[in-house]
Amino acid sequence: MDQNEHSHWGPHAKGQCASRSELRIILVGKTGTGKSAAGNSILRKQAFESKLGSQTLTKTCSKSQGSWGNREIVIIDTPDMFSWKDHCEALYKEVQRCYLLSAPGPHVLLLVTQLGRYTSQDQQAAQRVKEIFGEDAMGHTIVLFTHKEDLNGGSLMDYMHDSDNKALSKLVAACGGRICAFNNRAEGSNQDDQVKELMDCIEDLLMEKNGDHYTNGLYSLIQRSKCGPVGSDERVKEFKQSLIKYMETQRSYTALAEANCLKGALIKTQLCVLFCIQLFLRLIILWLCILHSMCNLFCCLLFSMCNLFCSLLFIIPKKLMIFLRTVIRLERKTPRL
């Protein structure tokens, strides 16, 4: 049995309480992003095996401890269990081990991703985090970007503001905008500065959560096992069954949420189309009204011109007759020579 697992149910199984100053952190995310190296940077020692490359060296969940100020830091490193497509026996075994090592619950989940390379695999890993720990775990999650050196001295906030990766922006928003960046090659004061920045972010999160760690039904099941090792094998089996059911429930919840999101988007699209049709009809009606008004004006103008013409036709002959009569009278009065 691993020294970090004092029983089937982890180090707190026999009723011992975690220290108030203990800070439990779980490293999550896809393989190859630098999770283990990030854990080493936080603890400032080679606690987890790590090297450059996309192949993971972490084969199983492991735990290491260190300190920062007056806090004892407990970090749980995880293997490639967030990228597996199949829900196989190995996945359930590692998830169960992760729960045991992090009982009674993590204060922080560090979702590690590489700066500038948030891919569909990272999205799948983030989705698996929700399946394993629950949707509410996002409220205790900080997105940690590795390869901070790629910012070239720029601001991480500016990077996020300028990013056109909608999936990444959605993830950061779900995590309450909590982000941090690491250069896992940093040493000395540079390493201390970036760890301090992360710890400040964690302290803000803990203040927001009133110092409470994250928990769910599975952690509660672990805590209920504090009565001792009696029937421990049955309890382990019970936990596994509960874990499978929990993950299936989370998948169903996610699928339902996505369906509702698509349904909402469809409804919004339909409303937008109806609004456009209504606006188009209103414009047509307005155009017809204007055309009708112009026709009425044209008809009135035409009628006035016809009336004027008719009046002129009536007045001109009359004036001509008067003129002719006048001429005739003048001729009659003029004496002949």
UniProtKB/Swiss-Prot annotation:
It comes from the Eukaryota. Signal peptide: none annotated. Residues 183-185 are annotated as: G5. Residues 56-60 are annotated as: G2. The keyword Nucleotide-binding applies. One of its GO terms (cellular component) is endoplasmic reticulum. Detected in T-cells. GO terms for molecular function: GTP binding; identical protein binding. Changing R117D: Abolishes GTP-induced dimerization. Keywords: GTP-binding, Lipid droplet, Nucleotide-binding. It is found in: Lipid droplet. Residues 20-223 form the AIG1-type G domain. InterPro entries: G_AIG1, GIMA/IAN/Toc, P-loop_NTPase. Residues 29-36 are annotated as: G1. GTP binds at residues 31-37, 50, 57-58, 147-149, 184, 318-320. Pfam families: AIG1. Residues 146-149 are annotated as: G4. Residues 77-80 are annotated as: G3. Monomer in the presence of bound GDP and in the absence of bound nucleotide. Homodimer in the presence of bound GTP. Can form linear oligomers. Heterodimer with GIMAP7. PANTHER family: GTPASE IMAP FAMILY MEMBER 2, GTPASE, IMAP FAMILY MEMBER-RELATED. The heterodimer formed by GIMAP2 and GIMAP7 has GTPase activity. In contrast, GIMAP2 has no GTPase activity by itself. Belongs to the TRAFAC class TrmE-Era-EngA-EngB-Septin-like GTPase superfamily. AIG1/Toc34/Toc159-like paraseptin GTPase family. IAN subfamily. This is GTPase IMAP family member 2. It comes from Homo sapiens. The gene is GIMAP2.
